[in-house]
Amino acid sequence: LPFDVHLMIQNPKRYIEDFCKAGADIISFHVEAEEDVTGTIEKIVACGAKPALAVKPNTSVETVFPYLDKLYMVLVMTVEPGFGGQKYMADMMPKVGQLKQKAPHLLVQVDGGIGVDTIASSAKAGVDICVAGTSVFRASCPKQMIADLKKAAKDV
């Protein structure tokens, strides 16, 4: 399984080498958190990982357009970053559509509020990867929740 790291920190470029040494395969960082976006992407690639940019709900998806040809993936946040258990923001799905239209080769990931009742709308929008935290870890049977999530996404 790929080790996918989502850095929710300021100046992520400073920490790239440490995460690569720890075995990260994919490293996502917030476009809003780094002045040297291109340099950070290049550093991720140089250490052998795949670069990804994350976009907060209030940030225009067009902010990542200049970097699409250098990226493996874009992470569209479907909650405000910071804590688990927030409500899924379905109004982020147009960002997914814009990304798929502009760069069909790119993987699109969503993170935030993913559950059995929200994963289908993400799948319909064209999302490739859904991050499910609270719905899995607070479930009475996490294994069953994962199976239910997979089924709900496939039934689209």
Residue ranges and their predicted role:
Residues 3-7, 27-29, 51-55, 74-76, ...:
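Hydrophobic faces of well-ordered beta-strands that scaffold small-molecule active sites
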Residues 8-12, 32, 56-58, 79, ...:
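Active-site beta-loop-alpha junctions enriched in small/polar residues
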Residues 27-35, 75-85, 125-145:
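Glycine-rich phosphate-binding active-site loops on the catalytic face of alpha/beta enzymes
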Residues 1-53:
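Glycine/small-residue-rich loop that forms an oxyanion/phosphate-binding "nest" at active or ligand-binding sites
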Residues 19, 74, 99, 111, ...:
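Conserved, mostly hydrophobic/aromatic
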Residues 44, 123, 137-156:
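C-terminal helical cap(s) of enzyme catalytic domains, especially alpha/beta-barrels
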Residues 57, 63-103, 107, 118, ...:
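Glycine/Thr-rich beta-alpha phosphate-binding loop at enzyme active sites
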Residues 13-21, 59-71, 114-130:
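Catalytic cores of alpha/beta
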